[in-house]
C-alpha cells in the first residue's frame, strides 16, 4: 500500500489516477510529477517499486502544497477576506455566491435548501 502525504493510494488504479486522490493534485499535476521522475503513467500503484514511491513522496512533499497545508492556506485566505471586510469576504460570511452569480433565482447549492414560509391561511368554506 503506497501512502503519500497521509493518503493511501488505491492499489488497482494507474499511478496517474491514483495520485489524484491526494487533495491538491489533479490529472495535469499528476502527469507533471510522473514526467519529473520518468515513470510510466500506466503503471499500477501495486506494481510501483519502493524507490519510485520514495521519489514520489519526496517530490510531492517538497514541491507542492497538498492536503492539510493546502486546506489551511485556502481557509486562511477566506478568513483574511472576511477580516478586512471586503465584498468577497462578506459574501463568504453570508454563504452567498462570491463571483457575481445571480441570487434572485438559483444559487441553491451555496444558499442551502429552501426554507418554506407560511402563506396566508385559506378562509374556511361554508
Swiss-Prot record:
Keyword Ribosomal protein attributed: yes
Keyword Chaperone assigned: no
One example GO MF annotation: rRNA binding
GO cellular component terms attached to this protein's record: cyanelle; cytosol; small ribosomal subunit
Compositional bias per record (Basic residues), positions renumbered to this chain: 101-126
Keywords: Cyanelle, Plastid, Ribonucleoprotein, Ribosomal protein, RNA-binding, rRNA-binding
Family: Belongs to the universal ribosomal protein uS13 family.
Family annotation (PANTHER family): 30S RIBOSOMAL PROTEIN S13/40S RIBOSOMAL PROTEIN S18 (PTHR10871), SMALL RIBOSOMAL SUBUNIT PROTEIN US13M (PTHR10871:SF1)
Protein name, entry field: Small ribosomal subunit protein uS13c
Species name: Cyanophora paradoxa
Amino acid at each position: 500500500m503506497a501512502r503519500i502525504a497521509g493518503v493511501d493510494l488505491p492499489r488497482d488504479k494507474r499511478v496517474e489516477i491514483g495520485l489524484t486522490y491526494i487533495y491538491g493534485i489533479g490529472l495535469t499535476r499528476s502527469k507533471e510529477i510522473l514526467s519529473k521522475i520518468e515513470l510510466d503513467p500506466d503503471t499500477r500503484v501495486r506494481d510501483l517499486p519502493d524507490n519510485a514511491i520514495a521519489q514520489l513522496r519526496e517530490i510531492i512533499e517538497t514541491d507542492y502544497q497538498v492536503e492539510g497545508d493546502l486546506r489551511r492556506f485556502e481557509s486562511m485566505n477566506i478568513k483574511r477576506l472576511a477580516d478586512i471586510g471586503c465584498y468577497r469576504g462578506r459574501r463568504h460570511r453570508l454563504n452567498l455566491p462570491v463571483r457575481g452569480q445571480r441570487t434572485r433565482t438559483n444559487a441553491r447549492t451555496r444558499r442551502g435548501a429552501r426554507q418554506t414560509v407560511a402563506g396566508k391561511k385559506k378562509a374556511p368554506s361554508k
